[in-house]
Amino acid sequence: MPIPIIAHIAQFKYEHLITHWAQYTKAAIAVSTIAAFKFWTSGRTTTWERKMNGMVVMVTGGSSGIGQVVVEKLASLGAQVVILLRTEPDQFTVDYIMDLRKRTKNQLIYTEVCDLSSMLSVRKFATKWIDCTPIRRLDMIVLCSGVLLPPFMDRQTTEEGVELQWATNFLGPYQLLRILRPVIYGQPGHREVRIVAATCSSYILGNIDFNDLDLSNHPYPRKSPWKVVGNAKLALMTYLYDFQKKAEAHERPDKMPCNLHTIMANPGVVRTPGFRRVVSFGKVWGLFLYLLLWPFWWLLLKGTIHGAQSFFHAICSPEFASITQPVLVNECSIVEYSRKEITDPEFAEKLIKAADAQIDEVEKQYKKKKIKKSKK
């Protein structure tokens, strides 16, 4: 009985295929075209893997988006991961960390409070990190944190009065690396240290005014907030390039060569929570429109896993161990800088001087407020 039934079904499908072969061919071509286009828009993937057991990696922006994918990758490779959070972890974050430890079979995943938009929070964390004898191990710093405000939103400032995007995208990471410099320099000569920082193509639009870094005295570009992000990314890339050069010029007590490698990774346009906030204009109706256009976003843009491939490449590829120049990675390949200011030492010195002055002013104002509160 089963054999005649199977024969009947096979014959029916065969006849149906012959009758409607044109429709099936068109459908197959359409599906293949969409799949090929999606494969192209997803970008390149890295094939490198790396054993990171025993390594200590510090990650900013590791609680969502690309940073979250990077944290999971590092944990799966066996690294001890320190995730820097803006606030004390809530129950959701605690559950996520516990689940991540279970999935990756790695118990060495921790969180620390370090709000990159607050210079005082960064100083408190970084000072605590370096206040240790012997020097704490630190193999890698991955800077994934970033803020991009939606268009037509008013200027947002931190509690310390600094423009939010400038503080989070540049001034906070700058403060962190500036204070952690002794720890980075103090690592054993045989230990390779990497700094991997997120950037984006908006750095090409950067136009930094050293007398007004966060545009506090200029009209805020409500229609194009990415210009502020462009300033921050240009500043960060310039500082990282200078940071690497000064590390190479630093003479170690053991006379060994510099083993620091700085890589800036451009993930491209990725469907992250930050992107969703920007294209939805931070509104409920915008979010509804974003959901309606989801097939369009899915087809054209990368997911977080594909967006993180350049980070995976920067973390795992052995080619960077032999490169002494700070490099920019896009689609898992080293590319040239589009702004000559990044490699200009005079531009870097002006930037560092202005950033130091801004941080000093922020900390000075905080001390004044603290004294006033204590007198009340």
From Swiss-Prot:
<dbReference type="GO" id="GO:0005783">
    <property type="term" value="C:endoplasmic reticulum"/>
</dbReference>
<feature type="transmembrane region" description="Helical">
    <location>
        <begin position="281"/>
        <end position="301"/>
    </location>
</feature>
<feature type="binding site">
    <location>
        <position position="66"/>
    </location>
    <ligand>
        <name>NADP(+)</name>
    </ligand>
</feature>
<protein>
    <recommendedName>
        <fullName>Uncharacterized oxidoreductase pbr1</fullName>
        <ecNumber>1.-.-.-</ecNumber>
    </recommendedName>
</protein>
<dbReference type="GO" id="GO:0016020">
    <property type="term" value="C:membrane"/>
</dbReference>
<keyword id="KW-0521">NADP</keyword>
<comment type="function">
    <text>May be involved in lipid metabolism.</text>
</comment>
<feature type="binding site">
    <location>
        <position position="115"/>
    </location>
    <ligand>
        <name>NADP(+)</name>
    </ligand>
</feature>
<feature type="binding site">
    <location>
        <position position="272"/>
    </location>
    <ligand>
        <name>NADP(+)</name>
    </ligand>
</feature>
<keyword id="KW-0472">Membrane</keyword>
<feature type="topological domain" description="Cytoplasmic">
    <location>
        <begin position="302"/>
        <end position="376"/>
    </location>
</feature>
<feature type="active site" description="Lowers pKa of active site Tyr">
    <location>
        <position position="233"/>
    </location>
</feature>
<keyword id="KW-0812">Transmembrane</keyword>
<dbReference type="GO" id="GO:0016491">
    <property type="term" value="F:oxidoreductase activity"/>
</dbReference>
<dbReference type="Pfam" id="PF00106">
    <property type="entry name" value="adh_short"/>
</dbReference>
<feature type="binding site">
    <location>
        <position position="270"/>
    </location>
    <ligand>
        <name>NADP(+)</name>
    </ligand>
</feature>
<dbReference type="GO" id="GO:0005789">
    <property type="term" value="C:endoplasmic reticulum membrane"/>
</dbReference>
<keyword id="KW-0256">Endoplasmic reticulum</keyword>
<dbReference type="InterPro" id="IPR002347">
    <property type="entry name" value="SDR_fam"/>
</dbReference>
<feature type="topological domain" description="Lumenal">
    <location>
        <begin position="1"/>
        <end position="280"/>
    </location>
</feature>
<keyword id="KW-0963">Cytoplasm</keyword>
<dbReference type="GO" id="GO:0005737">
    <property type="term" value="C:cytoplasm"/>
</dbReference>
<feature type="binding site">
    <location>
        <position position="233"/>
    </location>
    <ligand>
        <name>NADP(+)</name>
    </ligand>
</feature>
<feature type="binding site">
    <location>
        <position position="178"/>
    </location>
    <ligand>
        <name>NADP(+)</name>
    </ligand>
</feature>
<keyword id="KW-0560">Oxidoreductase</keyword>
<dbReference type="InterPro" id="IPR036291">
    <property type="entry name" value="NAD(P)-bd_dom_sf"/>
</dbReference>
<keyword id="KW-1133">Transmembrane helix</keyword>
<comment type="similarity">
    <text>Belongs to the short-chain dehydrogenases/reductases (SDR) family.</text>
</comment>
<dbReference type="GO" id="GO:0031965">
    <property type="term" value="C:nuclear membrane"/>
</dbReference>
